Amino acid sequence: MKINFNNLEDDEKMELIIRKIKEDDYQKVFVLTDIHGRFDLFEKLIEKIDLKKEDLLLILGDSCDRGKFSFELYNWYEEMIQKDYNIIHLMGNHENMLFESISDENFRLNWLYNGGNVTIK
């Protein structure tokens, strides 16, 4: 189900997607959060859990900032989704700061202070 908030100003528009997840649809369900650009540790974890296409990887946000490898994380997610892996990534407060920082100077300073400075290096 998609809910559009079209009554907001253009720069405030949001889309809410509500999706029912039935755990019986997957062999295993893995839930991760706050990876913060640590692709090096994430790779080790994925190897250890031996993620399969029949599994679900649910990421509760905050993949970016603080660690040096935010781009690599999002790139990995995209590649695995293209290979038909079941990956759902929710927007965390760090993703929100990143997007808000594009058009809002106050958010930009807050984002940089909270680890965005490492992301853009």
Regions found by a protein language model. Give the residues of each.
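Active-site neighborhood of divalent metal-dependent phosphoester bond hydrolases
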Residues: 66-121
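N-terminal active-site segment of His-dependent metallophosphoesterases
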Residues: 1-76
